[in-house]
Amino acid sequence: MKHLIIVESPAKAKTIKNFLDKNYEVIASKGHVRDLSKFALGIKIDETGFTPNYVVDKDHKELVKQIIELSKKASITYIATDEDREGEAIGYHVACLIGGKLESYPRIVFHEITQNAILNALKTPRKIDMSKVNAQQARRFLDRIVGFKLSSLIASKITKGLSAGRVQSAALKLVIDKEREIKAFKPLTYFTLDAYFESHLEAQLISYKGNKLKAQELIDEKKAQEIKNELEKESYAISSIVKKSKKSPTPPPFMTSTLQQSASSLLGFSPTKTMSIAQKLYEGVATPQGVMGVITYMRTDSLNIAKEALEEARNKILKDYGKDYLPPKAKVYSSKNKNAQEAHEAIRPTSIILEPNALKDYLKPEELRLYTLIYKRFLASQMQDALFESQSVVVACEKGEFKASGRKLLFDGYYKILGNDDKDKLLPNLKENDPIKLEKLESNAHVTEPPARYSEASLIKVLESLGIGRPSTYAPTISLLQNRDYIKVEKKQISALESAFKVIEILEKHFEEIVDSKFSASLEEELDNIAQNKADYQQVLKDFYYPFMDKIEAGKKNIISQKVHEKTGQSCPKCGGELVKKNSRYGEFIACNNYPKCKYVKQTESANDEADQELCEKCGGEMVQKFSRNGAFLACNNYPECKNTKSLKNTPNAKETIEGVKCPECGGDIALKRSKKGSFYGCNNYPKCNFLSNHKPINKRCEKCHYLMSERIYRKKKAHECIKCKERVFLEEDNG
């Protein structure tokens, strides 16, 4: 009977299968096989604690059946999901669905997908780590509770479609704080006195009449001119010359956060793009040695390096660069994060033999660029430090001192691989006490610059330093803030949009802990403690939930609505009120601002406008198109006095059936249809099925609600948008 190995991704399964004989079957779970119910909180909360309602997604039902059948036939079923909390939880859920005792499923882990790594993992299985599973469940429960309860409240007070979250709101607060700094910034004009001496020596005034000048201290132009006039009359000599040797230490190998930062700064990749490419390099690509993973696991906060990899790197350095570039012993790095999972490794090439040049015919251009970045950084991390000589010269007169600084490279060390953009700034050969002639003295004005907005790289750096989130959350958090229209990223700068200010203002006033970086970091520490079996996850949830829910209930009563609706300049035909534009989950519509006293809704131009020609047969009112969760229908605009409704007639000229995309409501075909004012997409089983979309549906499911996605252009950018919940994912331009 074959042994069964269960991994997460099909690409990973395919690569591993190449390393094993016919006695092994490898199948992918394709991510989480079950999750909290999407149509409610999904968690039962009572005096006994927090009990999840896990549901197998319909897209996974057949796959789960297949896994169960294969497991029944297998003599051993190995759980080989990623060795992080998310991977541990996926393995746990798979084992639970198969059935039987958890102990009967050996858990194997590896940090690289190479034949040796897989074979070694099979020799050293362990049990599923329930502490890690509970840490993941606690994170999932916390995120669901905050997202479900707080997002509903925010949406009710501002506008639908907005959300709040445990990590995303803390990150958004950082962006808002930066915007406030920029807005509050007042430029300061200050002056420096810059001297030009003989021998091409340039220096700046650092003290006057025995008083050290602080940076930006000289703000009076008249005073600066007076000092200039006095110092121009003085005689000067070399007061001191100081030379020091300084090392530029080698940078450590990459972990997730630093890889995202460097890829953003040096390659122009977004964090999401970086992780997507890194995932492919980890799971397996074609190489001269066959299909294999060429980098180690890319979601890590560890800087550990395997002993064998260190030896490979040192041998490579000695062979290619010589003994001068090889330190006496291997360099060891440690993460600043005290809860870093040190069992993991830093991100490195799986084989130092696979130089970037050897892969140029195998990898796509963007894959090669990222691999080259990882390869060079790892090799450089094991080289000698670069060595500089720093120089400083002080030129003095009776009333003041000027200072000049320079440096020159003595030994390039790791710069041999990574390069060095800093040019030497050499000072002339001088001797102490020698006189030197002042050729020119200038008073130069400078204006302080406002704080720079965050880039994706710098925001990740701050999130990491504050302990907000973990390596796996940085990229999704920034992407989520973009998709929610809280931020925009232009020319590598992150700026906040109007809705972000409103949300943060509410959270700061009523839910300060959600946007408090210290609270967020402490919660991450609690999750780390759960993973290390130092804390009970049910107790952590209780400690958070009940105070949080008290604030939710208070918020419902105390938070003033900030909903703002655009005026149309038209009057309501029913009550004389003002018609305004509003938004619902189905899009924009025009209604009376006296709602709920007046429920008038004006029919706007839509894809299906048969209502424009139809009057209510009961009262003579206008039949307008409305939407329910079952689709579109006609209703009298005199509701609630008249409650007449009618199904829409099917548009006869259905055209252009979309290949490979089925109706999410009934499974029927979807086709392009036309009305007098435009085209739309509808189900061919109409009127039995009322599915309708203004944008072309595609064969892709929403990650949030698992409804059908559509493709559209939004603000001149291509995007995929959920037809139901309007979750939007922008398609990235090719930066390669």
From Swiss-Prot:
Its transmembrane ranges are none
* Region (Interaction with DNA) location: 163-168
Cofactor(s), by name: Mg(2+)
Say which domain of life the source belongs to. Answer: Bacteria
Q: Alphabetically, which GO biological process terms does the record hold?
A: DNA topological change
Give the molecular function GO annotations: DNA binding; DNA topoisomerase type I (single strand cut, ATP-independent) activity; zinc ion binding
- Per the UniProt record, the site (Interaction with DNA) maps to 32, 139-140, 143, 299, 484
| Top EC category | isomerase
Keyword presence, Cytoplasm:
no
Q: Any idea where the Toprim domain is?
A: 2-113
List, alphabetically, the GO terms of the cellular component aspect.
chromosome
Q: What does this protein do?
A: Releases the supercoiling and torsional tension of DNA, which is introduced during the DNA replication and transcription, by transiently cleaving and rejoining one strand of the DNA duplex. Introduces a single-strand break via transesterification at a target site in duplex DNA. The scissile phosphodiester is attacked by the catalytic tyrosine of the enzyme, resulting in the formation of a DNA-(5'-phosphotyrosyl)-enzyme intermediate and the expulsion of a 3'-OH DNA strand. The free DNA strand then undergoes passage around the unbroken strand, thus removing DNA supercoils.
Indicate the family of this protein: Belongs to the type IA topoisomerase family.
Subunit structure, per the record? Answer: Monomer.
Q: What is this protein called?
A: DNA topoisomerase 1
**Protein species of origin:** Helicobacter pylori (strain ATCC 700392 / 26695)
